[in-house]
Amino acid sequence: TIPYKKLVMEYCSYIDPRAKAIGAVNTVVNKNGLLYGYNTDYLGFAHLCDAHGVDFAGRTVLILGTGGTHNTVCAVAQDQGASQVLTVSRRPGPGQLSYAQAAASGAQIVVNTTPAGMYPDVGVCSLDIRSMPGLEAVVDVVYNPSKTELVLRAEEAGIPVAVGGLEMLVSQAVYAAGYFLGKPLEDPERQTARITAALRRQMLNVVLVGMPGAGKSTIGRSLAQRLDRRFVDLDEE
């Protein structure tokens, strides 16, 4: 992660042109004592957006955050024909917007590249998307929780696409595995879909809510045994 995705570049004997343009390396392969650096986050983010029908062509894109993932998202958006890419920062520099200014940006797509909303700070949301009419998609690269507060608010607002970053995480790892093994994995899209589905089953919980004596504990223990999951009773915690 940042800052290591940038710092590691000075130790690489070869840097893939895409990684060099982005300014970040997330995959390093030792080939006969020489370190080769690549960026698979680009492919992972592109896969995530393609899988959910996020179309950058002709759109104004608002990127929250200024770290290495910002550069990756910016590269994908520009390569796919975004008409304008705007950056939002808590401490805006030249050419950047503050969060207070973001609502008036006229953006159709918002991408969060900050840790805001990541576990354990799951209730954090830096941007009030309810004041942004015309939004078509909200993408959050955070994958834990599977739906951040930003994604949940986007769903509540009826924005057509509201998605977290789990598929990006899996996809970039699938492409990285290809570099580690010396050849691309067969059908990376299918591999990504399969692994993502398995991870979602592991990550998502079953929550039982009801009045005292309704049978939550009994049903919960039975479900936990059948699903091979840990049972948690908040009355006992």
Predicted regions and their residues:
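Rossmann-like adenosine-cofactor binding region
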Residues: G95-A162
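Phosphate/diphosphate ligand-binding glycine-rich loop within oxidoreductases
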Residues: T1-H52, P145, R153, A157, ...
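Glycine-rich adenosine-cofactor-binding loop
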Residues: G37-Y42, C49-D50, V54, G58-Q78, ...
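NAD(P)-binding Rossmann-fold cofactor-contacting core
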Residues: D79-L97, D235
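Conserved lysine of the Walker
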Residues: K216
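Adenosine-phosphate binding glycine-rich loop
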Residues: V141-M203
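Short beta-strand-centered segment that lines the nucleotide-binding/catalytic pocket of NTP-utilizing
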Residues: R229-E237
